[in-house]
Amino acid sequence: MEKLSANEIRQLWIDFFREKNHFFIESKPLVPQNDDSLLWINSGVATLKDYFTGKKIPPSKRLVNSQKALRTNDIENVGLTSRHHTLFEMLGNFSIGDYFKTEAIDYAYEFLTKKLKLDPKNLFITYYDGDDITFEKWKSLGFSNEKLIKGSKKTNFWDLGQGPCGPCSEIYFDRGPKFDSRGSELIKNEIENDRFIEIWNIVFSEFNNDGQQNYAPLKSKNIDTGAGFERIVSILQDGPTNYDTDLFLPIIAEIEKNTVFRYKIENYFLKKPRQTQINKSFRIIADHIRAITLAINDGVQPSNLHRGYIIRRLIRRAYWNGKKLGISHPFLYKLVEIVGKTLDYRFDIPTISKIILNEEENFAKTLEIGYNLLESQLKINKNQIKPVTVFKLFETYGFPVELTKEILAEKNIDFDLSQLVEFQEKHSQISRAKKTTGMQKVINSLTQIKAKISDFIGYHTHHIETKISFLANKDEEVAETNGENLSYVIFEKTPFYATAGGQKHDQGWIIQNNSTIEILDVFKDKFLNNIHVFKGKIVKNQPVFLKLDTKNRLNLERNHSGTHLLFASLRQEFGSEIKQLGSDNNEDRLTFDFPLNRKPSDQEIKSVENRINSYINQKIKRKYLVTNLEEAQKLNAIMTLEESEYMDPNSLRLVIFDKITTDLCGGTHIENTELLEKFTILSCQSKGSGIYRIRAVTSWNKYFEFLKGKIQEILSKISALKNKIKKIEPNFGLNLPNLVDLEQQFDYLKKIEDDLRIYYKKLLKSQLRIAKSELDANKIIEIGKFSFYLDFNLPLHNLKQIAATWREQNPRISFILGANLVNNEFLIIVSSAILASNQILEKILEIFTGSGGGNYKIAQGKIQKKPEKEVFIKLLWENITEF
């Protein structure tokens, strides 16, 4: 066994299986693409699932990968045990209907003993009782019965209850008695230990479970292998734990620069309690910063939602453990660069660091206060914690519930989570429900389709006479339809594009026997047949004429092509790390979702729009190229579009706009950028979790529709501003000219709106001088040791600004201010830096009928009539001790 770096081990794996004719699949992002069943990519095979189910055609029957994955279901064990991680890497080799048990075992043995030079004497094997082929194969490689451990269905049979399943064989490496004096009974009895390390698992998928525990042989047998990268590295580098390797030690060394504490590898055997806790904190930070960095790089922004909540939780857990090491300042953001080096991965270091720093700073502001609250509550309640305190720690101070639970566990304190269920549902929002919108309802008749029986010819043909290959209603195949219910038809050839890759289906007509029937929907089945939905009478054994709605197609092509140009322009504006998280193109508009660590400025969005219009003005021709995956990668084709799931990797269709972008795409596109005419961004809005959605339209018609809408919107704003100004200047007037040209009208009205806004602000500022003037000493009332200022004759328009300004200028005075409203009602504002404004208001509302609310610093309410000063003074004297 020779000592190798982690990067050398990974490359050895890839090169070894490439020599065995395996196609290398690069590590995919942690966020699953087109798979709502997963929160994260959580295994090496997760990104290849569609190849095994037959949904997608694999680039080769033999595949190899090194896939990064993320799991947080057992986060409490991270740092505590030798091998638990949030982010980990799985080495995988896979066979889809190609080699099987004998070759898979040969490859495993050869790689471990020849490439990694592990001594076979240190290898132990488990196998499924009854899997004689596997047993005999391992025996032929020199393994004795003592080294071959028989397993049960529970330990050595992969079965999800229904579908493909099969036995498995695990490979363990014996690290010797210094890790545990007990022998192979540790494996036999499934005892957690650090001596026998499982480094490899080969799953032989050879049966199908019908759901009733009846097993039938599969026609196509598969191999699914997973080898634990971090475990193999720790063995080859002789580290007692996974953390004692070049994957983690450089990160730990960087953490040590921020603290007087040191990580000590030798403590694994010494087991000094204080050092064990110190090591644990180092490990948690080193583990979490890897997951945090890679997840943010893959487009996840820290938030209180979904994946963003998990990343925020990891940041705060890591920051808390830094606190336990005496680190009282943000430091995690400094670790991003070293993470990139240890993972041999290129990151946008400045952007990721900035996001993490912002999270650390936000948490640091409330950490001390929140922790002190927790400590005080424990003292008051004699080491008991109330659910309401845990709720407040989350909502007010940003403590994830799980972090509070960990802090309490360290103090040996339990608390009941049952009362927090509703809270967790509301605030964790890590949805385990599958998405249902946009999914096709189950149509029983379509299960009768067993192969591809149709060709799409719509790239160049818009109408055709053809035959019907399949005709059905919801329940069964039919010879003709009755015209009363929805029906489904597959044609031998079709010009109608099916909804895919963010592009909506085509519209058009089926013509048969002088009857014209509208196409309602087009979608693909798993064989990539285009299934057309309609309502009308047609006969299967008679020819049909299909006619595309070309005007609708042009609008679809404009918007789909516009999406490509938008993606290219966004990469130009914000950098190549910009990713497409979703798109939706129909005949009316397009949308595009992308991650960014901040809100794009108006100037940046305008720059994106202007760049696209320059592409349009350049009149660039669109080209198509059909090639294989390897050639597409050489052309730097953008491979993230959703269309990829429908494509054969040996016959990929690229859409090319020279010098702008080359993208993998199966959709339809305009022939020249000039056909877009005009690209207009309608909005760029946050979807939460650091994801933004651009809505845009193409063509002059859509642009003018947009202008008309904006003009009406501006006119409404002008009218509102005019009314506000007239309340201050009753004689104010404004006449607007009628302009025919829409662009001129828009520009003119926008300027009027801006001018009015400026003028209105000037009027408010002039009124605000009241706030900046000296207080009237006659209106100051002394109640005990507190001072109150009462004034009920102030202007309504900026009363809240006056209250806030006076409070900041006079922090030792509490203000109760008022102004007349319509219908003889009266507005009251309470503003104080030293007393609870909301509690003062509550007392006011008890005496004077009304409603309102607020916070500690400022509160406002509405009462039925103007109050008398003497009543207020009496109220304050009677209740001053409660404020």
UniProtKB/Swiss-Prot annotation:
It is an enzyme of class 6 (ligase). Its cofactor is Zn(2+). Its EC number is 6.1.1.7. It catalyses: tRNA(Ala) + L-alanine + ATP = L-alanyl-tRNA(Ala) + AMP + diphosphate. InterPro entries: aa-tRNA-synth_II/BPL/LPL (IPR045864), Ala-tRNA-lgiase_IIc (IPR002318), Ala-tRNA-ligase_IIc_anticod-bd (IPR018162), Ala-tRNA-synth_IIc_core (IPR018165), Ala-tRNA-synth_IIc_N (IPR018164), Ala-tRNA_ligase (IPR050058), Ala_tRNA_ligase_euk/bac (IPR023033), Thr/Ala-tRNA-synth_IIc_edit (IPR018163). SUPFAM superfamilies: Class II aaRS and biotin synthetases (SSF55681), Putative anticodon-binding domain of alanyl-tRNA synthetase (AlaRS) (SSF101353), ThrRS/AlaRS common domain (SSF55186), Translation proteins (SSF50447). Keywords: Aminoacyl-tRNA synthetase, ATP-binding, Cytoplasm, Ligase, Metal-binding, Nucleotide-binding, Protein biosynthesis, RNA-binding, tRNA-binding, Zinc. It comes from the Bacteria. Catalyzes the attachment of alanine to tRNA(Ala) in a two-step reaction: alanine is first activated by ATP to form Ala-AMP and then transferred to the acceptor end of tRNA(Ala). Also edits incorrectly charged Ser-tRNA(Ala) and Gly-tRNA(Ala) via its editing domain. Belongs to the class-II aminoacyl-tRNA synthetase family. This is Alanine--tRNA ligase.
